[in-house]
């Protein structure tokens, strides 16, 4: 039976994906959000889903309300619903109920969730009817699907309503210092989540924190080293992607190619292969569809503007920065790697300042954008982007959206824009600068 859903905060990456999924399943879907452009809204607009400014008038009694996790009682629509005792569900609570209708495949972990969810969704949907929800704002819904692939987020323990049949956990790392007190707190959250997985877990076997995880369901370890249950080996990394074999209990289960770059993407693919092998999916079909994966939004997204290579990536943690630069070096081994990075949240910048500096030193040159504070925090002046610049050994300087011309001081370079805030504004300024230079030279 068709329902009407109203999403409060529809531009959120998970919310927009869920909205698309429900829309494709035949439900009426609309939502509200701030006016500022966010990369997820393009997909919503293409689907014909209405995006409204926040207003009490958006809410009618016949709707089911789904509220984004960032929106609290000070939001006028949330306040209206509370005042009139109109029931609503948080995104993660709704998802926890929704997945009960499917055999569900979850992807959790500090880093690599979106890329791995995207890869698993791509392979499975090309083999059989599959619904999925990816953290880049992409969703697909099918009422007839047997399988549901989704991203499982640890922030504020949002994954606790989830009880999937299978779950990959890519890694454990200290992040979200505004919520987690330290690495032990992060591990405890993942351990609680792991206990809810019903059939099998697939965890990276070379992560010391992950190896402490205990769960009633069988745990399969994957990685590069002997001793793992699924081992990636005979690895060849080229400018066309990565080739490797996977063995399980001494038996080769397949030879695979992924058109992706960086060691982390080989691990992501190995996790997907392990999960689908245990779920009984034909490995020949898995190999076929791994070859055609085109990536997910804002994860090593490339474009060429006037012969200049630009990469856009969501990387906003030191581990992710290292992985993104590693991927850029694999694809462009003869080019200078120029990193343009915007720190995301003051709390994360303070907690990981030294780690950010070490990670950015993997690039050849570094440019920094002003820190992007989250809506949940206030800039108390405890850290400035110049503090990070001072700790970076490689050539570095701070740029503004209005003046990105220092980026032109490089020949034969790849420009890697990284961040989870509004780093794309800097990228667009650079693209405009390149376009204007070309016009002036004609």
From Swiss-Prot:
It catalyses: UDP-N-acetyl-alpha-D-muramate + L-alanine + ATP = UDP-N-acetyl-alpha-D-muramoyl-L-alanine + ADP + phosphate + H(+). Pathway: Cell wall biogenesis; peptidoglycan biosynthesis. Keywords: ATP-binding, Cell cycle, Cell division, Cell shape, Cell wall biogenesis/degradation, Cytoplasm, Ligase, Nucleotide-binding, Peptidoglycan synthesis. ATP binds at residues 109-115. GO terms for cellular component: cytoplasm. Pfam families: Mur_ligase, Mur_ligase_C, Mur_ligase_M. It is an enzyme of class 6 (ligase). One of its GO terms (molecular function) is ATP binding. InterPro entries: Mur-like_cat_sf (IPR036565), Mur_ligase_C (IPR004101), Mur_ligase_C_dom_sf (IPR036615), Mur_ligase_cen (IPR013221), Mur_ligase_N (IPR000713), MurCDEF_pg_biosynth (IPR050061), UDP-N-AcMur_Ala_ligase_MurC (IPR005758). Its main location: cytoplasm. Cell wall formation. This is UDP-N-acetylmuramate--L-alanine ligase. The lineage of its organism: Bacteria, Bacillati, Bacillota, Bacilli, Lactobacillales.
